Amino acid sequence: MAQSTLYSRVLGTGSYLPPDRVTNQQLADRLAKEGIETSDEWIVARTGIHARHFAAPDVTTSDLAYQAARRAIEAADIDPQSIDLIIVATSTPDFVFPSTACLLQNKLGIKSGGAAFDVQAVCSGFAYAMAMADSFIRGGQHRTALVVGAETFSRILDFKDRTTCVLFGDGAGAVILSASEEPGVLGSALHADGSYSNILCTPGNVNRGVIEGSAFLHMDGQAVFKLAVNVLEKVAVEALAKANLAPEQIDWLIPHQANIRIMTSTCRKLGLPQERMVVTVDQHGNTSAASIPMALDVAVRDGRIQRGQHVLIEGVGGGFTWGASVFRF
């Protein structure tokens, strides 16, 4: 008797935003005290961002991940002990080690002894993590995965640099992927090019108790924009080809919520109407690895994304990294 093909499919989604919502005007007022000029109009015109959320000083990335994970577990209606794989995509972990995934496993009280580890691909992190979880499930090594994107980017922002500090926010999003005989994740594509590592980075490290280099985020905005609009369309088309789907068969596009201009450019190149693109960057800002799962959860909970629909996610981030996945929800 032939063995049935295993797939991974999304059982549930969850997200969490810290309660401190900071509007552009509030941020501009804060920066003005440091002699830094910006405005709501300036930020909106260049990014599409109106507000973002910042975590309180005593709140960690694993705290945000825990809240999102609980909601995803509840939505999936599963026993947390059935989770045998946890992957957390983050560039702002609680510690150098142990991993945020191990800390999250403990906070959730999961005693299954399954694998738990972090993925660091910055804003592409969730696309990387989801593709990895899908591969583990298809290969039979694991059956139920908790995949999380969580960030506290406010901790690495230089609030004297108005070109970066207005862009980012904190938050977490999560999905439960489970083994299924019904197709879920249909195709993924991941890429990186380390020769562009200097255009988006936090070039610091800990050496003998001292931070060497810079602990703040650095970005060459123009270089990132040019590279992003070039690679995102290509990786989306590649993932679609692996899924044997044409762009017009996609019901929803969920791009990394970096900048509305990058997002609309990719949507247009794929020939998709803007109405099929999920947008949360206006209220969340750029939450790096958390942005895609947070946007997914928003669109699932407000009823836009329905079971059986095809969803394309794509992201690009520091490294330079980029990736995409297509799944049937």
Curated annotation (Swiss-Prot):
InterPro entries assigned to the protein according to its UniProt record, in alphabetical order: ACP_syn_III_C (IPR013747), ACP_syn_III_N (IPR013751), FabH (IPR004655), Thiolase-like (IPR016039)
Encoding gene, per UniProt annotation: fabH
Matches recorded under CDD domains: KAS_III
Keyword Acyltransferase recorded: yes
Source species of the chain: Burkholderia vietnamiensis (strain G4 / LMG 22486) (Burkholderia cepacia (strain R1808))
Record key words, sorted: Acyltransferase, Cytoplasm, Fatty acid biosynthesis, Fatty acid metabolism, Lipid biosynthesis, Lipid metabolism, Multifunctional enzyme, Transferase
Record-annotated active site: C123, H256, N286
UniProt cross-references to SUPFAM superfamilies, sorted A to Z: Thiolase-like
Name used for this protein in its record: Beta-ketoacyl-[acyl-carrier-protein] synthase III
Family listed: Belongs to the thiolase-like superfamily. FabH family.
Assembly description: Homodimer.
Catalytic activity of the protein: malonyl-[ACP] + acetyl-CoA + H(+) = 3-oxobutanoyl-[ACP] + CO2 + CoA
